Amino acid sequence: MAASVFCCLRWCRDGGAGHIPLKEMPAVQLDTQRMGTDVVIVKNGRRICGTGGCLANAPLHQNKSYFEFKIQSTGIWGIGVATQKANLNQIPLGRDVHSLVMRNDGALYYNNEEKNRLPANSLPQEGDVVGITYDHVELNVYLNGKNMHCPASGIRGTVYPVVYVDDSAILDCQFSEFYHTPPPGFEKILFEQQIF
């Protein structure tokens, strides 16, 4: 009897038969393989400076995604979503069908068309946090946690968070551990998992 109990305890301690160790999911961050040639990414893939754009390393697969950008230094910048076909050396983004962005002047652009605009008294300033929600149809903007009721749509296909900077702008990205609580139903970007 004692031998069988010992055997059982050893089996549990060693992880049991067929134990598969869990791999830690990679962190969502700015992707140094998908950025403009004059872009600088620092702070473990969380800060962008220089000139040009950069995609995040994870596409928006889930139904309702949320992410944030904090404006550390003003200048020319834009944030939103883009496909892998977006030209990250040609800014501002939003000039073609490969990106939908809010620019630093509060205008939301897609395919070189202004789709919406933030109120003039609600333009993001240095230190502000801009939240983005995306549900595969509509992109919405939040300023310091407040819904700006400024939706834009049109982009199709697999999209990624995108950010571009120029003229001394510095932006920090938050893909988790947000400054503000995501709106109901929206959550951080999840990596797609394949099980087989």
Swiss-Prot record:
CDD domains: SPRYD7
SMART domains: SPRY
Annotated Pfam families: SPRY
Gene3D superfamilies tied to this protein: 2.60.120.920
Domain of life, source organism: Eukaryota
Domain B30.2/SPRY: 1-184
Protein's recorded name: SPRY domain-containing protein 7
